[in-house]
Swiss-Prot record:
InterPro entries: Rhodanese-like_dom, Rhodanese-like_dom_sf, Rhodanese_C, TrhO, TRHO_N. The keyword Oxidoreductase applies. The keyword Lipoprotein does not apply. It comes from the Bacteria. Catalyzes oxygen-dependent 5-hydroxyuridine (ho5U) modification at position 34 in tRNAs. Gene3D superfamilies: 3.30.70.100, Rhodanese-like domain (3.40.250.10). The lineage of its organism: Bacteria, Bacillati, Mycoplasmatota, Mollicutes, Acholeplasmatales. The active site is at C183. One of its GO terms (molecular function) is oxidoreductase activity, acting on paired donors, with incorporation or reduction of molecular oxygen. It comes from Aster yellows witches'-broom phytoplasma (strain AYWB). It catalyses: uridine(34) in tRNA + AH2 + O2 = 5-hydroxyuridine(34) in tRNA + A + H2O. This is tRNA uridine(34) hydroxylase. SUPFAM superfamilies: Rhodanese/Cell cycle control phosphatase. One of its GO terms (biological process) is tRNA modification. Residues 129-223 form the Rhodanese domain.
Length: 308
């Protein structure tokens, strides 16, 4: 995290599924504007909309929000805002991609039509306590490992694009169930819940505003969430449950409670693993013997060691 003398910083997360006819031109103009405000972060622009997370001084973030909302396409965009004491991104990246989130479907789903009904945080809390409801985590395996809703189903996928195949292989688990999906901020569930409806599942819902909104809502305060929430910035993990903290993460090597993520020191692997500091040193920051012996091992380079 880039430290500064000013602690008045914000990080925002937002998305909007809305047609953007010329994503590249939009991207170029947007980059110049964000750069002029001194904002850092990552934004994806596609013909289907925008998905972004940015950090910067409070005044500049609010200028950005106000400016974006002046565009009729984004006048109803919901911004999830958190206070931070520094920039949480190293740089500004705005890319044009085919999809805001990659579900890799052969046929695109129409997000303007049938998608999972929204459950407000209070309604989601009620669903968490109902017996016949299937709570389905729509995030990646390393996100689930750090924290998740109690009794949520883990598809154990490495990438979001793996979810459709998981659904087809596990139809027996989902059939005739009330399915409630959740993700970090909601952008993945918009598309995933629409896919579920298209596949013939009728009783489909999604957590409105994602885990972030659930954790901050005064009536829910993140209850029945265990662990921490993985975020895609330099914080890596943030608190959701304001009532109690239950550690669910386990060290990759010894299985002890752990909430510290590292990337495998082999740059060609880069796998994220939960790992205590002493095990990082013991295993040279690598996830396997093969990776620890890699000639480009970053841990060894950092500590001026040589492979044996």
């Amino acid at each position: 995290m880039t430290k500064t003398s000013n602690s008045s910083y914000l990080v925002i997360l937002y998305y909007q599924y809305v047609p953007i006819k010329d994503p590249q031109t939009f991207r170029n103009q947007h980059f110049k504007y964000c750069e002029s405000l001194g904002l850092l972060g990552r934004i994806i622009v596609a013909q289907e909309g925008i998905n972004g997370t940015l950090s910067g001084p409070k005044e500049q973030i609010h200028k950005y929000i106000d400016q974006l909302k002046q565009d009729v396409r984004f006048c109803n965009t919901v911004f999830k805002i958190e206070n931070v004491d520094a920039q949480v991104f190293p740089r500004l990246s705005i890319k044009v991609k085919p999809e805001l989130v990659n579900l890799s479907l052969e046929e695109k789903v129409d997000l303007t039509k049938d998608k999972g009904a929204y459950l407000a945080p209070q309604e989601f809390l009620q669903a968490l306590q109902e017996k016949d409801v299937l709570i389905l985590d729509a995030r990646n395996d390393y996100e689930y490992d750090l924290g998740h809703f109690r009794n949520a189903v883990n598809p154990n996928i490495r990438h979001f694009r793996d979810l459709p195949n998981w659904v087809k292989q596990n139809t027996h688990l989902l059939k005739n169930k009330k399915i409630v999906t959740y993700c970090t901020g909601g952008v993945r569930c918009e598309k995933f819940s629409t896919f579920l409806k298209k596949e013939g599942f009728v009783d489909v819902y999604q957590l409105e505003g994602g885990i972030i909104s659930y954790g901050k809502h005064p009536e829910t305060q993140g209850v029945l969430w265990d662990g921490q929430m993985y975020v895609f910035d330099q914080r890596i993990a943030v608190t959701v449950n304001q009532k109690e903290h239950v550690i669910v993460g386990k060290d990759y090597f010894d299985g002890t409670p752990c909430e510290r993520y590292i990337n495998c020191s082999n740059p060609q692997c880069n796998k994220q693993i939960l790992c205590h500091e002493h095990n990082e040193h013991k295993y040279l920051g690598a996830c396997s013997d093969k990776c620890s012996a890699h000639p480009q091992n970053r841990y060894l380079k950092k500590h001026n060691n040589k492979t044996s």
